[in-house]
Amino acid sequence: YRCHDWVMSNREEFLTWVRSILWDAEVAIHNGDARPRRAIWSCNDPVTVLGALKNASGQQELDELFAHLAESFSDCTSYEFDLLEAEVLGDAAYTVGFEHTSASVNGVPRTYTLRATQIYRREDDAWKVAHRHGSTPPE
């Protein structure tokens, strides 16, 4: 057993989760289904969103935000997450990257990019999102 091996396997396990379960949840919300995204978010406060459309703090505001997003989004034709950096530190992790999305927003087809930074906690052996900051990149 070497410490480096544990760190690499922990990071690879996290990245596999990001590229599968997290990715699926993002596609779902852009198709109008908030349930998969809500399932990957922590049910323990604090949880926060500094969003491109709206901010949220705490469970009630998070639920309201996700319901609003699900009502706004539909017809996702493309979602790509360009991961710039990710790190796992014990039971915490983060990702930084660009989200490239093509979906309808309030019925109008749009293609846009967001800068996204997310912080995760391991809870009951599962990764959960605790914070998200999404914003449009500078021109």
Across the structure, where does each feature detected by a protein language model lie?
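A beta-strand edge to alpha-helix "cap/lid" segment located at domain peripheries
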Residues: C3-P36, P46-E139
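Conserved catalytic core of Hanks-type protein kinase domains
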Residues: I40-W41
